[in-house]
Each structure stands twice: as structure tokens, then as C-alpha cells.
Amino acid sequence: MAESSSNPTRINILGKDNIIIDHGIWLNFVAQDLLQNIKSSTYILITDTNLYATYVPSFQSVFEKAAPQDVRLLTYAIPPGEYSKGRDTKAEIEDWMLSHQCTRDTVIIALGGGVIGDMIGYVAATFMRGVRFVQVPTTLLAMVDSSIGGKTAIDVPMGKNLIGAFWQPERIYIDLTFLNTLPVREFINGMAEVIKTAAIWDESEFTTLEENAKAILEAVRSKNKSADRLAPIRDILKRIVLGSARVKAEVVSSDEREGGLRNLLNFGHSIGHAYEAILTPQVLHGEAVAIGMVKEAELARFLGVLKPSAVARLTKCIASYDLPTSLQDKRIVKLTAGKECPVDVLLQKMAVDKKNEGRKKKIVLLSAIGKTYEPKASVVEDRAIRIVLTPCIRVHAGVPKDLKVSVTPPGSKSISNRALTLAALGEGTTRIYNLLHSDDTQVMLNAVAQLQGASFSWEDSDVLVVKGNGGRLQATSTPLYLGNAGTASRFLTSVVALCNPTDVNSTVLTGNARMKQRPIGALVDALRANGVGVKYLEKEHSLPVQVDAAGGLAGGVMELAATISSQYVSSLLMAAPYAREPVTLRLVGGKPISQPYIDMTIAMMASFGVQVQRSAEDPNTYHIPQGTYKNPETYIVESDASSATYPLAVAAITGTTCTVPNIGSKSLQGDARFAIEVLRPMGCTVEQTDASTTVTGPPVGTLKAIPHVDMEPMTDAFLTASVLAAVASGTTQITGIANQRVKECNRIKAMKDELAKFGVTCNELEDGIEVTGIPYTELKNPTEGIYCYDDHRVAMSFGVLSTISPHPVLILERECTGKTWPGWWDTMSNYFKSHLEGEEEPHSSHVSHEKPRKGNPKSIFIIGMRGAGKSTAGKWMSEVLNRPLIDLDHELERREGQTIPEIIRSERGWEGFRKAELDLLEDVIKNNPTGHIFSCGGGIVESEAARKLLISYSQNGGIVLLVHRDTDQVVEYLMRDKTRPAYSENIREVYYRRKPWFEECSNFRYYSPHPDGSKALTEPPFDFSQFLSVICGHSNHLEEAKKKPQSSFVSLTVPNVSKALDIIPKVVVGSDAVELRVDLLEDYDPEFVAKQVALLRSAARIPIVYTVRTVSQGGKFPDDDYALALKLYRTGLQAGVEYLDLEMTMPDEVIEAVTNEKGYTHIIASHHDPKATLSWKNGGWIQYYNKALQHGDVVKLVGVARELSDNFALARFKASLAAAHDKPFIGLNMGTAGKLSRVLNGFLTPVSHPALPSKAAPGQLSAAEIRQALALIGELEPRSFYLFGKPISASRSPALHNALFRDNGLPHQYSLFETDNAADVKELIRATDFGGASVTIPLKLDIMPLLDEVSDAAKVIGAVNTIIPVGSGDKVTLRGDNTDWMGMVYALRNAGVVKVSKESPAAGMVVGSGGTTRAAVYALHDLGFAPIYVVARNADRIKALAESFPADYDIRSLSTPEEVAAESTAQPSVVISTIPADKPIEQSMREVLVASLRHPSVTNGKHVLLEMAYTPRHTPLMQLAEDAHWQTIPGLEVLAAQGWYQFQLWTGITPIYTDAQAAVMGN
């Protein structure tokens, strides 16, 4: 550590020079000063475990050399983080001190950040009624804030710092060298307190902070690994820390015990602490205070004591240090997993603030930068606080009569953005007055600074001083993020073309989701035509774009379509003087839109020294000379004329008077005409001078409609006109506003939809809107609130209408007005005296606009080698997703009217074929973007252009699926297949050449584990359906697992899945998912791993947890092979695994890549501590929890238990976090002592199985063992299950279910309850321990009225054989179902019967007409059989049966052999017998059956008879079928299968079928 070269600086506090500050004072100075001036027999150095090794041993060495022999230095370390700052740790330290015989002369040294300082200070304050201590802050936050002033405290469940004492340190040693090792986020965190101090006390210090933000951040973020990485800002650093510490010392000296003045140091903390209380520990103190400062400044602005410009300046300064300024900041959302901060909870947290007086909340209000409104915190009512904390605002009518106000709107956004652009491109310094302080201009300021185009500073809080660099801009590697700032995006697209290359040759402009929909195509076309390279990175014709650093336009003649936006024209005009030759700009395509804005740009360019000549011959042509803008000394920005329409409209609608003092007839802005051309014809009195406009409205309710008004010169003002027209008498027609469809939203549609909520009818016109007014007293209540589409003008317009609505109006998205008038709602409150209330967003609000549908509706493109199975996969996909399948080869032939071989043989050749193939691909991507499946030809990837299309499609949310199977199988198949054109080269060579192309084009890969010709290929196999459900976003496994009290996944520890296929079905029983330990596989080749996933999915039939466990985390994968790890993670994502375990020790770039590409796969963010370095008893795990919370859908933390109590510590840790976050959490301890943690974990517990070769982790239990343990400790209550019916004494059901309960570790019991009266079971099925029941004859129908709901199948069948209690506690619902038909289907499928396809129809037959017959008919229909023949004695019963089913079941009676012969084309291939087997078959039925079983058409294919009777086991009908060479299935198979399904419905566990079968058969 560097040492101080001169005497350190001292700061006086409370009359003593006790604050000592400099670089490098820790080692020599501190030890000597302590020993000389703060003498003691015992010094105790307390720090945290992160700092101990770095700073304690070296200090010990120095101290012990200098100390007398009778002086001792003890050291103690606690875990880092806020979690340690509590009663437990304090007690632990005190007990340790007592055990070391520490007495009242002890001096404690608190080395660390705020947590150490606060808590150790409180230990000092209370140990033996107070001992001396010194502060050695190591973080910036502690240096400037918590270490100074003697406030000490611990946290308690009710809040932070609520128990503590004032106890002044004897010394505060601030060694700035500590900051060299401070992590970037911690340094930035501390800057919040530095900004705070300057904001309340010293504007000159605040200006220093503004000017040095770039330099400070560059040094802090530098990759320089040297010990003195902050050397470039050494002097700045000392100045800002010294300045901040001095202010705090001065305030504390004046008011040590917080009588009033010291409250000022709490600026930003009242609201900030409330946020922190909810969001800790994921959000740091400084981050919460940064947001709190912005909110408290907005509060001061709302109360009318702080200028909007000061709020904007404070916000910009905070943002310039990369601190968050709102809860919507992407980093905050990510860090907290989107946790909400409800306003009522925030106000509750604020109610326990120490500054408050009783129930009155006190908040520090700024009156200017560097100055507070009062020399103490001010009392503020909850209503005002609620307004700034909530996203929505409710506006009540009630503007006072006879009101006369003067309102100055913010500077024009249009003029502000142009002024900033011109000043940044100009030479010299200019002062810009009345600049709009808004999101849009902030974006522009940030972007220009990033391009090094100009430097900015503030004077008198609201004058911006711009020093331009004369157009010398530098390309930047960091994308310019423009939010939804449309004006900035258009101006900057041309401006960045002026950049010179740096270490990068281009600049990327991007924005939010809405910005990525807004058009910019015409401007890009013009730039490209002039030689500037511009590339769309996502959607064509919209941001993001990558613009080459061209050093300026080429110049000459440029053409631009100007019918969509005049901003394109202004953008080129302003950049044109820096072209390499003079520019002639021609506007083509029709009359330019918004000509006044073009005129505004030209007039402003003249103010900055460049004269544009409009052509005399063609008014749409402009000549721009070469030159450099010369910045004027001052430039005054007019108020925004579009914004001025709102206060003027309030006067118009409420019959009051409003003056806008700085917009008149000589305005540059077209919207200045609004008062004369719209308000006057509507009945208002308008007085307009050159520079001001005054409007007085007619009596309320007497506005007149305007039959027609062309608002083309003032398009943005049409929204204001529309809300006035809504309450005017008659119909108003507004035209000339077509461009308003492509603004922040489609404003014409927005107006129509939102006015409809008030009961106002509008019609959309081609270029406008028609509004039919109604009396204002008849306006309806828009109960859901007004949705603003993130559009400032929509919000402000409806604010105007709300002032006379008979119902208070809720406006959603209050803050979107920040784009042009951040203080609009303050203006309504302070000037128009509107009563406003802040509200949370209602849950139902505008769901249709915002909430994405579950799943991905985009079309799917299938690629892959010829013969890989694309057509088959396409058919399966079409069936599963119910989407049309289009084979692009067939479609190409259809469109061309030629076969592909004919096209290739024609003069067009291969090149012509590939061109046609590419054109077709482009067409379907453009015209069929959703709801389709396209199977591409194998050679589509041969074309680079086609590859680019597919890559772009997959990167923009589309699915490009690569289908593949074993390469040898594909080659062998193609060698056999003579129906396709032959390859001109070796098949294998073709595949290996195309393989990298297939991989780069696809974002998902299906590796088929099914051998060619397997029975699975006749219908979609389970593994394929499961894969599809994940990649299309239809899987809800995580949601289902969260609802279960217990869930688990079994860890598969095999080197090759193909060698374990026989045991996999057994080991997955009772688990909700199966973990593939990729690190334990014998080969890490991605193709081998993909095959393992495919085989496992097919064999296990449950979701997959895909894990690559590194050596340091307890696995086998190399710790530092990050490239291969990322490749394997991507293999898992492309294979559509349900869960992917992502270790939080991976580098950030790996974590970011995986989380960005995860699609619908759920990330299990994990950290394992096999060496037991962390403890659940303190905050050691918190940093890993925070990181996992940020990146995972599930958090998984695994420690080691050395003793039983470690499991209870883990349980407490989990409980404390569960209260704050509902993210699923797997928390375990490894080792024998940790078994209890596995039993208690609950959610997705990793389990083993006795059949596996080894356990994946020490202490792992099987799922059955966990259930047994839960039963023993009372967490899994025994349930009673029954069979109801009569006679039932011979039933095999008890044997079946009790065996399965036993095998799966369940404590339940299944018993017989014999009765033929449903009333007898009424109380039994409502008992608290009732688990479920089987129902047999004669109660299958009688039981139904006793149930709460019945499944659709049971309704159609008309019988219930299973009762399932759903829910728990008081909310149990009894559901009836029927598993008889499921058992029949399973038994038939087991025998090889497959679902009937439409292409190959087949008939089925049922014998009998009793109760079970209905289930048999349902089963055959489910399998696709039609017609379904019924053979029975009673023709009337057959007729009644047929009529009771829907017509598409096609039920037909067969009563004679002749009828069998007549049905020769559709003889049954499956027969289900439901007649008793203990009596002979009735003769006429026997004849029909013999004729059918022995019909000549049944000699081919599979023919199966399923016998439902099971006594005797081999029935006469089975013999009859076997004699005719039919395959037969005995009735006990169905009994086993239906009971097997019942068990699944009751327990959620799917046992192995053969176990159920063995129990039934008595094996």
C-alpha cells in the first residue's frame, strides 16, 4: 500500500481535529497515532472476512513492532454484508471480547465499510457502558458518510438502524488508497452520498462532480490491475472526499444529536431508506438513496419549491455516475428480479423514520442545487408523497372559476434537440437558456458526450453551457441507447455518420421495444445512397442500426422521401455542412410532411452561421453549403408550442384564462397557430402578440365543434384538439395528421380507443380522425383507467379532459410526461389547483396492450440434411401445434409450375433454382411471420443470403429448428432411397460441409433417438412433444412444481445414457425431473451430448435438468474451460431442456450469454461450497443468493453440514429470504449431517435411486426415503383411500395401491368399503384425511351428485370410477374422473396399437352395451377409430348408446353375419369386449363375432382383442379370437392400468407399470 508523502489533512469535528485524510496512512501513521494519542492496554481490530487477509496481517506486523510489550492487539473477523449487522453478531462479538478479558480501557478499531462502522461503533457504545473506538472506513460510502458523526446502530426486522446510539469515534482515519481495491459497484454506490452532500450544501462542489464524472468513472472502470489504478484521479478523489467529509463534519458540529440541521444529511434517505428496506440486500444503500434523491427532488418540484431544471440537473448528475434514477432502471429490475415496492408498504416504512414528528413525515426538500428549502427536514403530507411514488395519477375535476394564470411551458423539444445538435457540431461556446430538461434531451446530451462531440456544464442551475468541438466526433464501441426518444434517434443517425473511426469503425444506435418498431427506413436509404454504410441489426427499417464512421457524408445530390417524418429532412440538413462537397437535398415522393419543422431547422441553422438556400425552381429542393457552425454566445429556446396547447386547452375547457408568455405569432413552431386556428373557432377568446398568447374559454360545456380543420402544420396538437372536440357540440373532423400513426404509438387509434372509454365516438380517417362530442356531464367513467402507450402527449391530453370529467379519472403511466414536460402534473396542481391523487396500477389495466401471450406464435422453419427426418418432424409438429405445414420444395414447385429437377435441367440451372428458393424463403418470412411451419430443402444453407435470412430470423425471436439423427443412419437411408435426385458428391462429405451452416442458422436442434421405421414414427413421439412444449413456451412445469409441497429431481450419474436405458424408467419414478450430469459423461463433444439429451428425454419422459458441474463446485468439469462450458450450455439450450443449472462462479460474459439465449428454458442459478467455507449462520451466502436471484428462475445454494444445527441455520436463512422474494429456492447441505436439509427442502430436491451406480452428492437420499422421513416427522400426513361398490371382496385394488404406496415411501392406506348406497360414503369423502377413492358398480353414476366437479371424459362416458381431492385445508374440491378408458388405451398401446391417422382410417368394435361399454367407445374414439361397431343383444340399447354420443363417433350396430359382410371395406382391427365371461356368449352375438374375427380382410396387419372381464383369466371370447389369429389382452391388464392411472392422479407419482401389473397379477 502506498504511503503518504506529506502530512495528512485534518478536519475539525465537534472542536477536535479528529478526521484525518490522505493517501496511504493505514500502515505507519495509524498505528503510531493510536499508540501515542489513544493509549490502551488492549486494541481490538475488527473487520470482515473479505478484508482480513488483505489488510490485517500487515497492520499487525507494523503495530507489534511499534507497541510496548504490555500492549496487545486482538483481531476478529465477521462475514461481510448487511446480514451481519444484527443482534446475533453484536452478541457474538461481545461474548468474544469478554472471553478475552477486555476491560473499559479497550480501544476498538472498526476497519471496513458502513456495516462494520455502524455495528462496531454500537458495540463500543454499549460494551461496559462505553469504550473508545476509531473508524477506519474502507469504502467511499463510509468515508464520506457513515464513519463521520457518531451514529452507530444495528438493523432489526422492522427496519435499518433502529436500535443504536450516538457514540463519537476518537479518530476517523480516511485512507484513500483503500479505494484502489474497492469493486466498481461499491465505489459508484459511495458516489451517491458525495452527490447528496453537494446537492444540499455546495453548488460549486456539485459542479465539480458534474465536470469530473467521465474521468472518475473511466478510472474506476479501468482494467488496470496495478495497485494504484485510481492514480489518474488522485487529486480529484481527495478533493471530493474532503469536500463531502467537511460538509458532514460542519453539520454534525452544529447539531450533533439531530435537532434539525443534521436532518439535512438525510436528503434522499426518507424515500431511499424505504426502497432499501424492501429491496435489501440486492440493492445497495447508495443505489437506493440515488433513487430516493430523484424522488425527493420531484416531490420538491411538485410542491412548487424547486425548479424543474434543478431536478433535471440532479438526475443527470446521478445518472452520469451510473447510479440508478428510478426503480425501472434495468439493473435494479435485474438485481431484484422485478420485485415491486407497493406505495402503502413504502409509506409504512417511511413512518418509522427517526426524523418524523409523531405521524407527520419529514423530508428534506431542495430549493436549488446546493440549497435546501428549510434548514431542516420539512413536514410533507402523505398525499403528495404518494403522487411521486406511484405510477398512476387520479385527476379530480374542480379548476376554480375566474382563475387567471400565466404558465411557462418547458423549452421546445424540437428546438432543444436541434439546438443541442447544432451546438455540439459547432465551434466555440454557447449558453442555452430554457432548454427542455426531459428524457429526450437527456438522451441527446448523453449521446453527444459519448461521441466526444461537445462538453457540457451548468450555470445558475438552468443555463446549459456547451463547448462544441466543431463536428469532430469519435465513433464509440458502446451502443447509444436512446430509449423511446424518436427525435434524438433520427438526428443522431445522420450525426454518427460524421464520426471518425477510433478503435471501432462504426457506432450502434438502439432503443427500447417501442423504438425498435418506429420507422427510420427512408433516412437510412438516403444515407446509403450517399455512400454511408448502415446495417439493420434486427428488424428492417427500424433501430437498432450500425452506422459506419464515414467522417461525413459524400455530398452532392441527395434524395429523400419526406412524407413520413420531417425529422429525416432536418437530420440530413444539419449534417450536410460537414459533407465532402456541398449538398443539394431533394425531397421526393409527394408533399413533405410538417413543413414548418423544416423551416424551423433552416432558421436555426442560420442562427448558428450556416445559410440554407431553398431552390427558386423547386420549393422541395435545398442547397446546403459546406461549412462549420459558429456557436452564438447565447441561444434562448422557445417554450414548446405543442406543450403550450395543454394549459391553453385547460383554460378553454374550464372557462378560465391562461397566458403563455413566450409563444406568440412570431414563433418558429407550427403549433403556435393552435390558439388562433383551433381554440378561437371553438368559441374561445384569443389574444396573441408577437411573443405571447392568452386564451379565455367560453362557459363550461359550450365549446363548439369545428366541421373540418387541417392540422398538418401542427400535427402533434391534434390530440389536444381531440379531447376538446369530445365535449364540444357537434362533430369535429381533423385531417393532415397521417404521420401521427408512427409516433410514440399510433396516436389516432389511441385517441379513438381511449375516448371510447368516456363514451365518445370517433372514426379513424385515412389521414385523420372524426370526433363526435357529447355533453361533458354525460362523460362515462373510464373505470380501467386511461392507458397512455408510453406517450407523453396522450397522458397530457387526457389530463386536460379530466379537469371537467364528472368522475375522477385514473391516468396510467403518469411519468411518461417526462419526455417533454416532467412537471406537467405539478403545473396542474400548483397553477390550475387540480386535486390529484397517486395510485398503484390496477392489475387489470390494459392487459391486452402489455401482456405477451404464453408461448411463441412465430412461424417455425425446419432445416437439416435430406433424409434427417424434416418431413416427419414437420408432420408431428403440425399435429401437436395445430398449425399448417408447408414443404417449401413442394411450394416452390407449385408456384413455379415445374418440378425441382425440371428447373435444374432448364437454362436456369442450379443458380436459378437457388435464386427461386431464396425468393420463396424471403417471401414466407415476410408474409407468414406467425402460425406456420415451413420445412426447408436440405440445400437451403448453400446460399449465403438464405443463411443470413435464417440467422436474422432466429435472432429476432423466430424458431429455426435443425432436425438430425444418427449420421450413419441418414447416409444408409439415402443410399437406399432412389426417389430423390442423386448427390453429385459423397453424401457424408455434403453433410460435413453443411454441418457448420446448419448450426449457425438454427437456434434449436432436435436429435431424433428413434431408429428408422420404429413404431413411434407413425405419430408424434412423447419426447418430441415434450421438446416442442419447451421451445414454443407451452411448458408450465416450473409453475406446477412451485404449487407442490414436495418435488424432486433424480441425479443421473452415468457416463453414457445409452448404456443405462434399462434402468432409467425405474430411477425416475417419483421424481418430477431428471438431472443429466453432463460433467460425468464420457465425452464432451456437443453432438454426443445432444444425443444423450435425446436418449434421456425419450427414456425418462419427464423434464430434464441439464448440469455441467465444475471441479471446484463438486463436479468433474474443468474449472477454467469457459469456452467449452459455454458451448455445452448452448447445446442444452438448443436441445430445449426444461432446466439448465448455471454456476454463478462462471465469468459474467458466460452468464450473460446463457441468460440472454435461454428462450423458455428455466435457469437454475447455483453455487456449491463443497469445502464448507461459508456458513448459513451469518451473511456469507448472501452475495451468492443475490447473484443467483439476478440471473436465475430458480436459486440453488448447496453448503456442507458438519452438525445437525447447520440444517436449522439453513432453514432460518431460507425463511428470511422467502419473506422477501417468492423465487423458488433449493437450499441444501451436503454430507451425512445434512440429510435433514434434503428432507425439509421441499422444492426440486436432488435425489438419488438405489439402482444408480453412485450418488451425485454426499448425503443424497432417494425420493422414497425423503417421503418416509417426512411421514416420520409429521410433515407428510397419512391419507385414507377406499374402494366403494358391491361386491368388492375379491378386488385386487388394495394389493395394487398398498404395494405402490409402500414402494414410494408413502404412509397411506387403501381399504375396501363395501356398499351399494352412495349416501353411505358422503361423510367419508369429506373427511380431513380422505386421500381418494376408486368407485365400481353399482355406484359409478350414483356417486356423481356428491362431487364438486367431473372431468370431461367422465361426463361423456357418464360414469366416475375415481375420486380425487384437489387443494388442501378448507379449499378441497372433490373431482370425479374415469380411468377405465385410460387403462384400455394403455393396454392397447402396450400391445402395439397406434393412433389411427386420417390418411389410414380404421374401424373398432365394442361387444356389449353395459356401463363399461361407454368407456370402451370413448377409448376407441380417443385412438381415432371410426366407425365404431357395437355388438349386443338389445338393439334398443345400442340405439340409445349411439344417440348419447356425438355424431363424429360414428357408432354403428352389427347384428347379423350379413351385416358384417356388407361392411367389407371397414372391418374392425381392434375389439373391446365388455360382456361377463362367466356365462356363454349369446348365439346371435357369437355368429357376428365369428364372422368379424374371421373376415378375409383381417388377415393383414395387427388385430387385437381386449377382454375387460378378468374371471376367468382366459375367457371363451379370447379363445375365439386366438383361433382366428388375433392377439388378445386379458382383463387384468386393464385393471392394472386403470389403477396405475388412479395412483398417478392421487399422488402425482408415475410408478413403473410393471410394478402395478405385478401387484394385480399377484406376482
UniProtKB/Swiss-Prot annotation:
CDD domains: DHQase_I (cd00502), DHQS (cd08195), EPSP_synthase (cd01556), NAD_bind_Shikimate_DH (cd01065), SK (cd00464). It is found in: Cytoplasm. Residues 1278-1563 are annotated as: Shikimate dehydrogenase. Residues 1-382 are annotated as: 3-dehydroquinate synthase. The active site is at 258 (proton acceptor), 273 (proton acceptor), 816 (for epsp synthase activity), 1168 (proton acceptor), 1196 (schiff-base intermediate with substrate). SUPFAM superfamilies: Aldolase, Aminoacid dehydrogenase-like, N-terminal domain, Dehydroquinate synthase-like, EPT/RTPC-like, NAD(P)-binding Rossmann-fold domains, P-loop containing nucleoside triphosphate hydrolases. ATP binds at residues 864-871. NAD(+) binds at residues 48-50, 82-85, 113-115, 118, 138-139, 160, 178-181, 189. Keywords: Amino-acid biosynthesis, Aromatic amino acid biosynthesis, ATP-binding, Cytoplasm, Kinase, Lyase, Metal-binding, Multifunctional enzyme, NADP, Nucleotide-binding, Oxidoreductase, Transferase, Zinc. The AROM polypeptide catalyzes 5 consecutive enzymatic reactions in prechorismate polyaromatic amino acid biosynthesis. In the N-terminal section; belongs to the sugar phosphate cyclases superfamily. Dehydroquinate synthase family. In the 2nd section; belongs to the EPSP synthase family. HAMAP family: EPSP_synth, Pentafunct_AroM, Shikimate_kinase. Homodimer. This is Pentafunctional AROM polypeptide. It comes from Sordaria macrospora (strain ATCC MYA-333 / DSM 997 / K(L3346) / K-hell).
